[in-house]
Regions:
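C-terminal beta-strand-loop-alpha-helix "lid" module of Rossmann-like NAD(P)-dependent dehydrogenases
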Residues: 26, 30-80
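Functional cleft and adjacent loop/helix regions within the main domain
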Residues: 103, 108-109, 122-141
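Active-site loop immediately N-terminal to the catalytic Tyr-X3-Lys motif
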Residues: 2-9
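Proline-centered helix-kink/hinge sites
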Residues: 5, 40-41, 86, 123
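Core catalytic loop region at the nicotinamide-binding pocket of NAD(P)H-dependent oxidoreductases
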Residues: 35, 74-120
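A hydrophobic C-terminal alpha-helical subdomain
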Residues: 67-84, 88, 130-141
C-alpha cells in the first residue's frame, strides 16, 4: 500500500480495511467463509472529481497550504489519470469472486500493482523524497 501526502485519512481507512480483512479471514475460516481484500487502483468514478472539488473549497490564499496548492490539486486528481472503466473493474471482480478459491488479495485497476510494488521496493527515504517532490513538499515554507 502506498501512503501519499494529502490523503492521510483515506490511506488510514485503507490500512484499516486491510487489517480487518486479515482478521476476518482467520476468524471466519472455521465457518467456511472466505474473505477477499480488494485493493483497487484508479477506477473511473466521481470520487476523484469530488475530491478535486472539495480540495478547491479548502485552498484559499489565507491557507498555510496556499504555496503548495498545486501539489494538493495533483493528489486530488491522481485517480483521474488513465482510470480503469468501471465495467471492466466490475467484470474482473465478479470473475474473481466466482472462483472456488478466490485470492486473498485482489488488485484491480490502473496503478493497483505498480504503486504498492514501488512502496515495497524503494527505500523509505527515497520514496519519501520522491513523494515530497511530486506533491511540492520538498521546500521549506
Amino acid at each position: 500500500m502506498l501512503v501519499t501526502p494529502f490523503a492521510g485519512a483515506y490511506c488510514a481507512s485503507k490500512a484499516a480495511v486491510h487489517a480487518l480483512s486479515d482478521a476476518l479471514r482467520l476468524e471466519l475460516a472455521p465457518f467456511g467463509v472466505q474473505v477477499m481484500e480488494v485493493q483497487p487502483g484508479a477506477i473511473a468514478s466521481s470520487f476523484a472529481k469530488n475530491a478535486s472539488h472539495e480540495a478547491e473549497q479548502l485552498i484559499s490564499e489565507q491557507s498555510p497550504w496556499w504555496p503548495i496548492r498545486e501539489g494538493i490539486r495533483a493528489r486530488a486528481r491522481a485517480s483521474l489519470d488513465s482510470p480503469t472503466p468501471v465495467t471492466e473493474f466490475a467484470r474482473d471482480l465478479l470473475k474473481a469472486v466466482q472462483h472456488t478459491r478466490p485470492p486473498r488479495l485482489l488488485r484491480l485497476g490502473n496503478g493497483s500493482r505498480l504503486l504498492p510494488l514501488m512502496a515495497w521496493l524503494l527505500p523509505k527515504g527515497l520514496l519519501d523524497m520522491a513523494l515530497r517532490k511530486r506533491f511540492g513538499l520538498n521546500a521549506d515554507l
